[in-house]
Amino acid sequence: MVRDSFDGGHTGDPERDLAYEREHVRRDTMSDEVVPDDVAQYLIYFKRMIDEENVVEIHNLYEHGFPDLTERYFQQRLWPNEEAVENIVGSGNRIVAFSDSRIFIILYKELYFRHVYTRMQRGPSLAHRFDSYQNYQELFCEVLTPEKQPLSLQLPNVWLWDIIDEFVYQPFCLYKANPGKRSPEEYEDLLSIEQNQSAWNIYPVLNILYSLLAKSQIDEQLLAIREGRNPDDVADDFGRSALYFKLGYFSLIGLLRTHVLLGDYHQALKTVENLELDPKGLYNTVPSCLVTFHYFVGFSHMMMRNYGEATKIFVNCLLYIQRTKSVQQQNQQQKKNFQYDVIGKTNEQLYHLLAICLTLQPQRIDDSIQSQLYERTGERMNHMSNGNIDEFRLAFQQGCPKFLSPTTVVYEGPNQAKEPLLRQCNAFLEEIESQIMLPILRGYLKLYTTLPTRKLASFMDVSDADYDSFVGKLLSFKMIVNELGKECMDRCEIDDSTTDLDFYVDKDMIIIADTKVARRIGEYFIKQIQKLQEVNRKLKELPVIPAVSS
């Protein structure tokens, strides 16, 4: 029996010896569970692309390679652990031909834990939650620690955004508030973690995000861009680094989301005041980032009663989702079920929020979005227009984000994870109750050009004792019509038809002006002609099958 020279000691060929040593180490460490060869080769190649900073290949490996291998090999089990991967790719000390793999291992673990979160039906264990957060801490430590020169690392935009997004989202707060998700053994561990604040905690999260802003000088650079200046003039080597610029940029949106989840809507908008709703923005390169940005900015405006501004932002986002629907469906199929369909879920939420905004402040929107809105929520909008507070509650709960209470820890008893949502919902409904008659009030005002306040009060069955509060509600409607204090995010000089009604009160008389914008009939026909031409063009491209003579 002749033995292959490769199956034994050294051959004298450095490349074959290195391959043998790597394979030998991998098999020794994975005696209980052999890593498939495809996975081992994928990891080795992935690390090499990280070392070479080949962003195009990294993007392909991240977006397609990892989900594909997950679908093939890891439906019922987890990816190899850290030690196994180190032995596959080489740890630096054991295999001298490979550079130190610390950064790659951290990045691999980021994918590993994301897979853990999607695969475990009852949620990850406390140990996994702890290790996942510590891994993010290590990653940002590598980014923020250098003082003289930036970290030598390049990653695709979508991965950088996912890192920030997952870091902000970490559902540890929901886990802490729900004793039903914990085993009895995890009680003591959670107590220790909370005392040391060594898992997801709002203060270090905010500290890291603001540190990324400072390190990248992103606010100064965005301000320079808006003013037409060269951003490099206000940035140092870190700010000019693509890695730091993008992390800082996405951290702004991460902070926006964090402040919204905490219920601080003014600070949320203040955080992104230098980010414009611009089709050339960096967030446009990552669809889920674009949708997240629009959703949270629009939601903040809605909670601050800027319903007209919120409507415009929601409609723009829905139009984007509508235009890219086929592309997103294709991407989601390629990713299998590894990554959550953020865009699909947000699309549904946007319609519920848009229904609230248009009920409180009607305005003309895109025809295609309006038809979809009435199809989905038409009956609900009718109920809300008639003052049904329960429909407002349901629409809010179906459209709002998962609010956080970072300090809440429940060691035993009922699930308290929904308490933050209920607090925000109740605060929102208090505002709505003060405006609940506004849609009805608007209906009466549209029937007149002048109307005494007493007569309007009698129409709405307002008693003399409640007359003063009724006048207050009238002034509230006036404020909504004018959108006092509105801060427009896009700062674009466009035709802004926010409402079709305006009025003022002169002593005891209401003077109403119908400001309805005339429908652009010519524009409508032009759009329909373009659609007809497109249909004709497609029909002409179809092959013509000759009729078969009988």
Curated annotation (Swiss-Prot):
GO terms for molecular function: translation initiation factor activity. GO terms for biological process: formation of cytoplasmic translation initiation complex. InterPro entries: eIF3l, PCI_dom. It is found in: Cytoplasm. One of its GO terms (cellular component) is eukaryotic 48S preinitiation complex. Keywords: Cytoplasm, Initiation factor, Protein biosynthesis. Residues 1-20 are annotated as: Disordered. Signal peptide: none annotated. Residues 309-503 form the PCI domain. The keyword Chaperone does not apply. It holds the Pfam family Paf67. It comes from the Eukaryota. The keyword Membrane does not apply. PROSITE patterns: PCI. Belongs to the eIF-3 subunit L family. Component of the eukaryotic translation initiation factor 3 (eIF-3) complex, which is involved in protein synthesis of a specialized repertoire of mRNAs and, together with other initiation factors, stimulates binding of mRNA and methionyl-tRNAi to the 40S ribosome. The eIF-3 complex specifically targets and initiates translation of a subset of mRNAs involved in cell proliferation. Component of the eukaryotic translation initiation factor 3 (eIF-3) complex. This is Eukaryotic translation initiation factor 3 subunit L. The lineage of its organism: Eukaryota, Metazoa, Ecdysozoa, Nematoda, Chromadorea.
